[in-house]
Amino acid sequence: MRNSNRGPAFLILFATLMAAAGDGVSIVAFPWLVLQREGSAGQASIVASATMLPLLFATLVAGTAVDYFGRRRVSMVADALSGAAVAGVPLVAWGYGGDAVNVLVLAVLAALAAAFGPAGMTARDSMLPEAAARAGWSLDRINGAYEAILNLAFIVGPAIGGLMIATVGGITTMWITATAFGLSILAIAALQLEGAGKPHHTSRPQGLVSGIAEGLRFVWNLRVLRTLGMIDLTVTALYLPMESVLFPKYFTDHQQPVQLGWALMAIAGGGLVGALGYAVLAIRVPRRVTMSTAVLTLGLASMVIAFLPPLPVIMVLCAVVGLVYGPIQPIYNYVIQTRAAQHLRGRVVGVMTSLAYAAGPLGLLLAGPLTDAAGLHATFLALALPIVCTGLVAIRLPALRELDLAPQADIDRPVGSAQ
């Protein structure tokens, strides 16, 4: 296979790196701006929740939009709108003064940026099988590379975010995010790939509601996808407040923005190694074992972090969490790609992503006030224990055995025929 055939894969991976790196900067910058002004974990959780509230609906709409308008077009438009939203922070400060960048403004702009992000991510995710075919790669290889790129982005993003906050301030740092989205747009603009353009009218969704319903019906009828979605929903709701509220609160209290970036980098670094090793791991270790081990390890590591050990210990635990969780999203992608028809893929990706975000706002809104009232130690424990229980339950779930079985039916079957 000629190297030129790898061009589409590399363009998609580069665009993913840029967009996700911009998001990584925002993960640090938005909560830091709030904590710097208000000093309250509860206020920071409001902004973090604002980024989550649009995601459930946005991911559902994104999947239908991708299957209707086309993957390439949706990716570029979504990145343009996300970039404009984050650029609004320094623009508001420039036009009305730094005091105008209050909690309400940050919450609105964070929500807008988050609302458009899922469409770009879904569009790029949906192009992976065709890019793999052009490059001569297996699905496991491109899924592992894609997840590794996401983790690499969240190494680069938070690190740049923490360093830029420490040097030029949180408001100016937002220009980094806008620039990253611009580079993502340029990469996808250069992409030429079958299936990336506007779909034929016979295969497009008939409407927004019917398109969402088709995706939901497919996921619900396929037991393995339904089970994976429920596990992801639970774990995300419990873990997300740790990364979005508890870690920023801990490091803000200690005036250590750079260390916050390092902690998030440790998670992403472990995830990078885990994702890169997924193609080899999938041959030797059952996917069901990988899944259960990841959830259990996440819960146990979070329980140790609850005792607020020294920073090097926290870093090691974060790296371990990332390492065991690195293969999880490639497993999700593999199941979707081998069971969903090409014309339905965007909707299925959107539904699976939306399930992960469904309980996010509730977890974030509870974590902030609980942290202010009971402290970081108690809140970490309150979130970690249910994750451990979820991992114990996952060990015995019969549906997860299907992760290691070949698909029983052709992926071009009708939407309602999943079993």
From Swiss-Prot:
Gene Ontology CC entries for this record: plasma membrane
Protein topology in the membrane: Multi-pass membrane protein
Chief place where the protein resides: membrane
Gene Ontology biological process terms, A to Z: response to antibiotic
Domain of life: Bacteria
Keyword Lipid metabolism (UniProt): no
Family: Belongs to the major facilitator superfamily. Drug:H(+) antiporter-3 (DHA3) (TC 2.A.1.21) family.
Name of the protein: Multidrug efflux pump Tap
Gene: tap
